[in-house]
Amino acid sequence: MKSTLKRLDTVHEKLSTAVRNTNSNLYSKRPAENEWSIAEVVQHLCLVEERVTEALQKGLEGESRKVGFLKKLIPMRIVSIRFKKFQAPKMVTPTNLPPMDEILTNYDRARARLKQFCVECGSERLKTISVKHPFMGDIDGVAAVSMLNFHEERHYKQIREILNKLEATDKH
């Protein structure tokens, strides 16, 4: 679990730094009508992290359930690959975007809660928790935490793409 939490910290720091270094007039600007702004991406990440932490906590309160062997073979790294665009479920679709500092503070808080939960729970107990992923179905708690790392990596790449598009548009 320590290595998973360390990877979470690494990608979180990269993403947070990229967002903090973003020109404020680009932060909430969409590169195209049907594409998210950087603000929307960060809000989405915060919402996802909060939902996963809530699901893990509920799973801990419930009866222990192990995820099937075949499900454990699905690599969570697949989440970071951006060859396919997914529609975010409504509950994690960003709305009412706060300013940059507030979104980043909320995101840091959500990460701190997740990490605290993981440390208190431990990886052996997390393996007995089953949570429902909207696209992959039931995954265990360790896979859910690992998935967050790759989900954040996916959106870090998206933020870089958004910045490239917006900066190219601003030059013209």
Cite the ranges covered by each PLM segment.
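Short hydrophobic/aromatic segments of transmembrane alpha-helices and their interfaces
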Residues: 9-10, 24, 108, 127, ...
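Hydrophobic packing residues in well-ordered alpha-helices of helical domains and bundles
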Residues: 8, 38, 103-107, 145-148
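Acidic/histidine-rich alpha-helical segments that form the ligand environment
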Residues: 7, 75-126
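Absolute protein N-terminus
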Residues: 1-4
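Long, hydrophobic N-terminal alpha-helical segment
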Residues: 8-15, 19-45
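Short, contiguous alpha-helical
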Residues: 30-77, 126-172
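Structural signal for well-ordered, non-membrane alpha-helices
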Residues: 12-20, 49-53, 57, 111-122, ...
